[in-house]
From Swiss-Prot:
A GO BP annotation: cell wall organization
Organism: Aspergillus clavatus (strain ATCC 1007 / CBS 513.65 / DSM 816 / NCTC 3887 / NRRL 1 / QM 1276 / 107)
Keywords (A to Z) from UniProt: Calcium, Carbohydrate metabolism, Cell wall biogenesis/degradation, Glycoprotein, Lyase, Polysaccharide degradation, Secreted, Signal
EC number(s) from the headed UniProt entry: 4.2.2.2
Region named Disordered: 228-254
Domain of life of the source: Eukaryota
Protein name: Probable pectate lyase E
Cofactor(s) listed: Ca(2+)
Gene3D superfamilies: Single-stranded right-handed beta-helix, Pectin lyase-like
Pfam families reported for this sequence: Pectate_lyase
Keyword Glycoprotein attributed: yes
Amino acid sequence: MLQSLLLLPLFLTSAFATPHDPTAHQALEKRATFPIPSSKGSVTLRSTQYVKGTFDGGMKTYGRGVECTGQKEGGEKDAVFVVEEGGILKNVIIGADQIKGVYCKGSCTIQNVWWKDVCEDALSLKGSGSGTYKIIGGGAQNADDKVIQHNSGGTVMIQGFTVSNFGKLYRSCGNCSKQYKRSVQISGVKAYNGKTLVGINSNYGDTASIDACASSVKDICVEYEGTNNNGKEPKKKSSGPSKACEYNQPLKKC
């Protein structure tokens, strides 16, 4: 009897200390896995800011002062930044008050850029059909669909990026009216709580090489039958390692 009385306070303490709300655990996990830097101030842009050469945002938060419209298609005029061919955007936090995050109109470098909350797409890669796009460091979270949308041709290099709560980290455009052969190289990426890390169109010769860690990510690399019919959705062909999707399965957990 005495032993039972002594154990009762310990049982009550343990019972009340256990969280019953599953979202509390998710919130803790998000804070632990998405290391967004502290903002040094905020800037609301009334129109898209175009970047030629190098723009260093000084780790301030930049937005457009508008509400996200979800997956409703936006355009260049809705972007926070548009980076011209050969431009560099670095040390920026993209706030939640925007429809489109960043456009690249050709080869570009996106360095230490963070998306607080992704709206339609975080980063759209456009251009004349070739070039190299570098995403170095930074991260994005809360993307219902795509983080990086690759519409142009060429090569995308994603290095040391962190992504959390997302639909797809990278997607080669599945139904652009003009299609290209595209490649993506992923290294040092940390991915948490997502549906698909990479989506490519293997029928157009797309390739992906992946060296990353992933926790609670359903598919690492998905191959689609891409189309140039903008009104048609591409069909999923397969998922997993292949000649087009190069990685060691399973990826290590983050």
